[in-house]
C-alpha cells in the first residue's frame, strides 16, 4: 500500500481552524467561552468572517512543501485539510450567522466563495507536487449527533443543511487538477 507521510498537523493550534485562518476574510481571537466538546469546554479561538472569503497564498502549501522534501522511494507526502463543509459549517452556526450575513446574504454566495478558495488551494498544492489531499470532515457526525439542535439552532432544516454540505464539498473538487 501507499506509505503516506504528513506533518502530523503539529504546526496547527487546531485541526481545522488554522486552515480557515489562512483565508482572507477570516479572523480569530482567543476565546472567552470556548465550545463544548464531549462535555468539556475546548478553549479554541473564536473564528468569524470579517469580509468576503478569498485566498492568496495559503500557508498550508508551504507546510506541504516541507513534508514533500522528506519523500523517498517508499513514501508519498499527503496534505490533510478540513473539508469545505467544515469551513461552511463554521460560519452558519448560530454564533456566527449574524456576522456572516454582513458579507453573504445567501448561503449560495458563501458556498461559492468557499469552493473557489478551496479550488485555489488545491491547485496550489497540486502545483507544489501534491497528489494526495485528505479532507477531514466532522460535519456529518455533528449533523446527526445528539445536541445538533444546539449546534445549528432550533429552526434548523437538517435536510437543507446536508444538501449544502454536500454541495460545497463537490463544488470545491469540481474541475480538480
Give the ranges of each region predicted by the language model:
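Domain-level signal for soluble alpha/beta catalytic cores
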Residues: 1-177
Amino acid at each position: 500500500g501507499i506509505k503516506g507521510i504528513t506533518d502530523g498537523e503539529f504546526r496547527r493550534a487546531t485541526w481545522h481552524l488554522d486552515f480557515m485562518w489562512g483565508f482572507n476574510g477570516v479572523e480569530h481571537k482567543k476565546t472567552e467561552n470556548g465550545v463544548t466538546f464531549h462535555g468539556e469546554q475546548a478553549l479554541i479561538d473564536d473564528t468569524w468572517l470579517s469580509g468576503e472569503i478569498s485566498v492568496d497564498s495559503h500557508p498550508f502549501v508551504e507546510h506541504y512543501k516541507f513534508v514533500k522534501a522528506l519523500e523517498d522511494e517508499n513514501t508519498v507526502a499527503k496534505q490533510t485539510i478540513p473539508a469545505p463543509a467544515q469551513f461552511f459549517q463554521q460560519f452558519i452556526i448560530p454564533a456566527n450567522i449574524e456576522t456572516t450575513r454582513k458579507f453573504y446574504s445567501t448561503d449560495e454566495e458563501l458556498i461559492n466563495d468557499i469552493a473557489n478558495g478551496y479550488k485555489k488551494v488545491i491547485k496550489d498544492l497540486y502545483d507544489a507536487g501534491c497528489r494526495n489531499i485528505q479532507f477531514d470532515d466532522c460535519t456529518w457526525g455533528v449533523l446527526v449527533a445528539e445536541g445538533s439542535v444546539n449546534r445549528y439552532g432550533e429552526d434548523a432544516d437538517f435536510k437543507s443543511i446536508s444538501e449544502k454540505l454536500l454541495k460545497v464539498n463537490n463544488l470545491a473538487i469540481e474541475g480538480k487538477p
